[in-house]
From Swiss-Prot:
Its cofactor is Mn(2+); Co(2+). Gene3D superfamilies: 3.90.550.50. This is Beta-1,3-N-acetylglucosaminyltransferase lunatic fringe. Detected in the neural tube, the eye and the otic vesicle, expression coincides with the region that produces the medial, intermediate and lateral neurons. Residues 1-8 are cytoplasmic. Coiled coil: none annotated. It is a single-pass type II membrane protein. The active site is at 286. Residues 53-73 are annotated as: Disordered. Mn(2+) binds at residues 198, 310. Signal peptide: none annotated.
Amino acid sequence: MLKNWGKKLLLSIVGATLTCLLVLVVDQQSRHMLETQSDHEPGSAAAVHLRADLDPANPGDGGDPANSAQDSGTFSAYFNKLTRVRRDVEQVAAPSKDSAAPEEDITANDVFIAVKTTKKFHRSRMDLLMDTWISRNKEQTFIFTDGEDEELQKKTGNVISTNCSAAHSRQALSCKMAVEYDKFIESDKKWFCHVDDDNYVNVRTLVKLLSRYSHTNDIYIGKPSLDRPIQATERISESNMRPVNFWFATGGAGFCISRGLALKMSPWASGGHFMNTAEKIRLPDDCTIGYIIESVLGVKLIRSNLFHSHLENLHQVPQSEIHNQVTLSYGMFENKRNAILMKGAFSVEEDPSRFRSVHCLLYPDTPWCPWKAAY
């Protein structure tokens, strides 16, 4: 009898020891999970909820300490709670499948596309754009230039003579941007998008991108050409200056501004104010836009790699991704011809910018595109 009692005592001790070990292991796992979650999401509600549920001395908000203690009284309840909370944490950490869902249902008619050019490029650049992407978006595209051109006006009724100088100077560029801004404000469009005359715009992709944002919010989207904020000096008075640093989207790649943000820019951009603002920092038009938005209004640039300028190596844009880009460009890069590398409907000699080949890739039903083009 004494021997049986000894066996029972030994089994009880072993069982209690195993139970304690299991509790310690689970507690260690829960603490490790808390530390990991804290490293990645220090302020997450799930992490706070986990701490409250697993620490009897810190019950969750709205919870009953007595019930919490009673639930924690058994290993089964403790383990079930740990499993349930871990599942909640994993669900919070998982990316949302709807993150790219449209914020606003818009069409191309909601976008004001401003193309900045100069008269000497009407034939060499604007005729190419008129034959390609503008041909499908005439009503949405407004051409801002410095000289009258009846031939260009016949192709599209949206040619606006800015009365600005034809020089490629800081003042002339800012003069044209000021007119672009004022014309957009006069319109009923939701989005203002600026591009240059060496840009191809995929309007379908542009609309898709802008639909992810609300035009009433403060949205400034584009691509910087610098790898750091630009440093400038703001003239406060004749004898008083201060340094300013800000990001700006390069005009050569194109950028877009929501109407909500554009209206807030009015004190520094409308009428003659834009020219005055540009003179305060003595920088060109696209820099002045960035200064007003980032430095004055405190709105951050949303960077998008879907915009491209001739200041980057365009050979790095793969042909398989051309249809997903918002803007493309061409020109010279490091003293070499800089354009999209692609097999297309036309040879490089026939189509040095590759815009015609890109257009036939996106719109193969274009009348002048070859029927059997190899891509």
